[in-house]
Amino acid sequence: MTKPHGLQALEQPLSSLPDTLRQLILERIQNLTHYEPVIGIMGKSGAGKSSLCNELFRGEVSPVSDVNACTRDVLRFRLRSGHHSLVIVDLPGVGENGQRDQEYRALYRRMLPELDLVLWVIKADDRALSVDEQFWFGAMQPYQQQVLFVLNQADKIEPCHEWDTRTSTPSPQQKANLKKKQAAITAMFHPLHPVCVVSALAGWGTEEMVTTMMRCLPDRATSPVATQLHGRLCTEPVRSQARDGFGEAVGRVFDTAESSLFLPAPLKTVIRTVRDAVVSMARAVWDWIFF
């Protein structure tokens, strides 16, 4: 079965709906299958943003031109693998140019609403976080739901000479210090999501991070993001999360249509019955639509 066949399978249960409503719902479901997530990544220079992206995503990279002068400090890259893609937005680091921090705050406020998720990357051994804290409470609070903190370069945490290069794992003492750092970041920022700890260059901690990241994404974004992950990171639990997210997003299409249109009660009953059948089918054909 191919992607078109998967979508055709979703059409069959819709046949009992009036044509206009059926077309509306089908179009919105098709939009879900073509959705392009937008993920922001921020952090000071040297935090390892590029290495983290390379560790997570496999898609072919191409720059996205932006003619808007107000976003001249923002770099956009499209990652494409197969029929799906996502956009990475590289946001300017805070606290590195005091004269422009106010400008950056305004920039973030403009851009954050369009992002599905922001990965805020912090070096595991970075102790100068007061500016980050000020920026978080000064500009990012309304968007907490979209922010996932990532402690990167776990291999640099002291005692760094104890990092096991053979197994790419931290020593017991490093693990203890990483837990302390994780707790310190949690206490400082009070994030809504768990703080992730990784070494992107060593490939340590990224599976756990991906699991957390998938839980933080809106339902519409989980499946297309899963298509861009390196194969070893697109585990069955991750695929299951994405499959369920797609089902939830499809269900929401029906819920929105039912609540926003003036429909007679008998038709609403039919919509709910069709909804359950289509959501079940969406989960069943998920692999053919996205992989």
What is the predicted function of each stretch?
Residues 71-74, 91-139:
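Switch II of P-loop NTPase G domains
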Residues 1-91, 95, 281, 288:
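Conserved G1/Walker A P-loop phosphate-binding module
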